[in-house]
Amino acid sequence: MAGERWQAEGPGEGWAIYVTPRAPIREGRRRLDPRNGDSSDAPAYGAHPSRRGRREVRFSEEPAEVYGDFEPRAAKERSPGGRRTPPEKFRPASAGEEVRESAYNLRSRPRRQRRAQEAEEMKTRRSARLEQHSQQPQLSPATSGRGLRDSPSSSEDREEDEPSSRPVTSQTASKKTLRTPEASVMNEDPISNLCRPPLRSPRLDSTYQTNGNTKTNEREATIVQQVNFFEEGETEDDLESSYSDITIRARSSDSLESRDEATPAAGNHPDSLRGLPHNQDFPAHENQPLLLTSGCQENPQEWVDRAVRMRSRMAYNNIQKSNFGNQSPSTSRPQSAIHHPNEPSVKIKWWLLGLVAILAVGLFWFFHTPAVETTAVQEFQNQMKQLQSKYQSQNEKLWKRGTTFLEKHLNSSLPRPQPAILLLTAAQDAAEVLKCLSEQIADAYSSFRSVRAIRIDGAGKAAQDSDLVKHEVDQELTDGFKNGQNAAVVHRFESLPAGSTLIFYKYCDHENAAFKDVALVLTVLLEEKTLEASLGLKEIEEKVRDFLKVKFTSSSTASSYNHMDPDKLNGLWSRISHLVLPVQPENTLKAGSCL
């Protein structure tokens, strides 16, 4: 049978006597080829007759010792004599065996009994190594709790009685030695390196499951290997030479997977993995000294202190890493936002600062300009009150309507929509009052700027050429307004040449005027000797219009672009007649002087 041991060969065969051959292939009943579409386990049609069909393999709960269709691993190792041992041939099955199915269960082989000489030699080496380390002081419970799983005496009994079918020893039976620096770093106890790990229930180990995780098994098998197994005939030199040929895999091939994969392994080996970080591996290098060897050369007390420090440092690092791993992304994002300021926030702050500056300038301009205008209006009102106190014979409508009209123009927003045009008229008895009052009203308008109003005398230009007068009037008004003067007075408007008056289209054309922030005061002296005070403003306006029409238009004057005609006069009148106010004579006014 597959589980029975074959008889040993001659003494020269070496390890071949301990090789368990693969179970023989038993032939059952032959099956017909699936020619008609039926499915069976028979070989395909046309296959070679010597090729047997596939077998169904069922795995038992015990670890498997048969490795499929290849040779046993022990058969590939070299024998002590230096030659390779050929694999054993399987003996034929007896005729009386009953072939039930083309399936069988894989069973672990029974442990072999050591020969007396071999067991005595291994005990001698082990006892010598135990005596070498028995002089070291006893470790603290915290130190020995992780490293010493069993006492040295129990480890011997466990090594003798433990089945050889453990996954760790069965997978590495062909190795000369297994010296793991990782186990030394984790346990840091020289005595624990001589102790075999405790027996584990084969039902709880995922290595024995057919659908188990091979990555976890590989990690477990690597970490559990803490004992140095010495084969027959090897020496200490062989151990040191074979140390450089072994690479310990402390983690699975895919170590970047989630930590949940490493948690079950840590549960199976709590003493081995508790102090080891998940993402830390310890590859064994050729020049790296063993912790056990260095510990034997140093003082035992120093070695114990170093082991305690290394263990506490590894535990502290593991706590830090676990805390960082358990931190949620929502907690880590605000920290990164604190260390690294957000650039859009800085830009928004700069934009806000610029906006505040613009608003400050706008508010300053908004509040400053009305304050200036308010001061100008107040100054104008004060001047008009003084004039009203001086010229007491004037009609109340003159002060009320004139002050309101010019004050409204001063309060209008900048730029103002149109200039302020005021026309004053009087009879022959109030000629001196008309001249003085018109100039003082214009000066009151520009009193805030402390400048004198522009003065143009029409009576002095009556005999001059119309074009020349027009040019002179235009030049005086333009220069004065450009130089900061905002008021002008034109005396004796009716005395100007008729054609020259067309220049006032430029300065009085409402929204199309050349200068809109100015005030013009025009005076017209009627031919009548006295002007009745009972006349209304409408009647006075008609009197002035009819007088200018007679003055500027005549049938003998040729019609041309530079000569006045009724149509042009009507257009000019509509532009200069915004407000027409009468002026009455003053008894206190002396000739040649103003009040």
UniProtKB/Swiss-Prot annotation:
Question: Cellular component per GO?
Answer: nuclear envelope; nuclear inner membrane; nucleoplasm; nucleus
Q: Where is this region: Interaction with TOR1A?
A: 368-595
Q: Where is the composition biased (Basic and acidic residues)?
A: 24-38, 70-101, 115-132, 251-262
Membrane topology of the entry: Single-pass membrane protein
Q: Tell me where the transmembrane regions lie.
A: 352-372
Protein location: Nucleus inner membrane
Q: Which family does it belong to?
A: Belongs to the TOR1AIP family.
The protein here is known as Torsin-1A-interacting protein 1
> Which source organism does the UniProt entry give?
Mus musculus
